[in-house]
Amino acid sequence: MIDLIPEVVSALCGRAELIDLLGGDYIWRHDVPEDYAEQFPRITFFEMINNDNRYVEDVADASEIHFQVDVWHKAATAALGTEVDAAMKGAGFARYSGADLFEEDTKIYHKALRYRTVRRYEED
């Protein structure tokens, strides 16, 4: 299994244009801290899939890894989504799905973006 969480954090937090649009580094894995429950815009992300891939002689040669990155805002999410996309593509991910959603109960706009990559295992 390959852990790409540090790479995703680095890609998102390291993109100055994204941080500027957010008004700070309001990017969290899974849950938003209670102190920031009303902070918008914000981004959350999580790893969805991390599977063995590319078998050579019955041994996995790589890992296929999927992440979902969610943009949350009280207004349009397009500009933030564009910056997330650039950050993730810059980190070697390909977007395979994107959806514009609206959370009726909270009146929050939500852009759900899904990315995948395949990385080879390092030889020991």
Name these PLM-found stretches.
Residues M1-Y55:
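Small/polar-rich, solvent-exposed N-terminal microdomains that initiate assembly or binding
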Residues V8, L80-E83:
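Hydrophobic side chains in well-ordered alpha-helices
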Residues D52-N53, A75, E122-E123:
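Short, cysteine-centered beta-strand-loop-beta hairpins and adjacent loop/turn segments enriched
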Residues V56-A60:
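Short, solvent-exposed beta-strand/turn "edge" segments of beta-rich domains on protein surfaces
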Residues D61-A75, Y109-R119:
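Oligomerization/assembly interface segments of phage tail-like spikes and tubes
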Residues T82-D124:
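Acidic-leaning, charged glycine-interspersed low-complexity segments
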